[in-house]
Amino acid sequence: MALEIQTKQINVNASSEFTFTNTIQEFLIGISRFRLSYGDSDHWVKTVSLSLNQQQPDSNTISVQVLGNLSDGSGNTIDTSDSFAIVVVVAWTGTADHTLLLANGDANTVFTLPSSSTTILSSILAGFDLAYDTDHYIAQINVSTINVNRNGNTATLSTTENMTDRDGNWASTATFNAGLIASSSSSPGFEVKATSNVYNNTNQSVTFNSAWTNFVPMMTGFNVEYSNNEGHWLKSIDVYLSYDAVNTVYGVSSMCDNDGNWQSNENSFVNGIVIGY
């Protein structure tokens, strides 16, 4: 039995298969990066969304389709050739481990934990849907770190989501998809370390208790906003979390239009976890 993790970059509206060495007992899917773009043009915004559709065609394979939406009310839509997600599939393979939970869900999902006492309890972001009633500028897009709300041996997930033009208009639709990693084992065979607000052009050190050889970052939330507290058209939004060989986490949360307006690096950040195994 072992933890296996695979990552792939998948364009919006495309699918890819993740084939593992052994039989998959349980799994979850998340992201370490996403980019949503109109292409060469900038436009108003009505909807910004990302979702991951998953299927398991056989005992060793997970198929993931990336769906994304960046659109206004005038027919301008996402450029799928310039829009993608880096998808992370975390799977426990081989013999089942009843001290472990890997699962995806949303605000309505009640997760059954392996125990009322856990050594690992971490959430990840797997998608979001933000929409105005009609076209507006974008000033800020925010999906706060997914919260784990625990009640004995069950848990639910929640977050706060915002999309605003800073002129009194806010998203009328705000939903999310997420995942949960939970273990009650004192030696699960991996560690999970969380980051806290990795701002643009900064980094954070992550220290593990064991000398793991593999490390994979996953996003748990983000905030991106234009400078000067202003709203503008949008050309693209690009958010990612990365991890290097010297225990350092880097994050970028960016957006821009075609008039030279960019995100505020002082106020834009990404949150996540790093799995060492």
Predicted regions and their residues:
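Extracellular attachment/recognition segments
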Residues: M1-F84, W92-Y277
